[in-house]
Amino acid sequence: MLKIAICDDEQPIREYLKRLVKKCTEGEIRLFVDGGELLADPTAFDLILLDISLNREQNAAEPDGMETARKIRERSDALIIFVTALREYVFEGYDVGAFHYLLKPIDEQKFTEVMDRAICQIRSKKNVEPLVIKVGGNYVRIPVDDILYCLLYTSDAA
């Protein structure tokens, strides 16, 4: 089951995004009002829909969407889809490893396409089989994500 976070400071937008997500997939969907609330949640989300302009005018003490994304990146590889009316931050959004950038008002067909691609990527990442190697007389399973470098030695004298 996918774990999805929706973080937008506008309640109608959060609810609208939740409805759109439910049309695309099943999963645990959590709603957040600001970046601080999202960052405080210990859940390991698979996908985060994040408004860039969070708290720009209401509460400067909380991180905006871009700062929230930077902090998420420090601890998680969750896919981030920015949902915003601000075109000028598109390149900065990709600097923090955003999966996609959707502009408000949201085109439902485009939203569905982006969600389908995101879900496919998340599922393919989760379905990677571990590498099984023989060490001595035992077989060891190593998650592919844990492999940094691999060197093969063979006993062939040829």
Regions picked out by a protein language model, each given a short descriptive name:
Residues 1-3:
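Non-catalytic signal-transmission and effector/linker regions of two-component phosphorelay proteins
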Residues 10-32:
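Two-component/phosphorelay signaling modules centered on CheY-like receiver
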Residues 15, 40, 91:
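Alpha-helical elements of the RecA-like P-loop NTPase motor core of helicases
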Residues 18, 31-47:
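Acidic, metal-coordinating helix/loop segments flanking the phosphotransfer/catalytic sites
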Residues 27, 45-146:
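CheY-like receiver
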Residues 153-158:
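Conserved small/polar residues in nucleotide/adenosyl-binding loops
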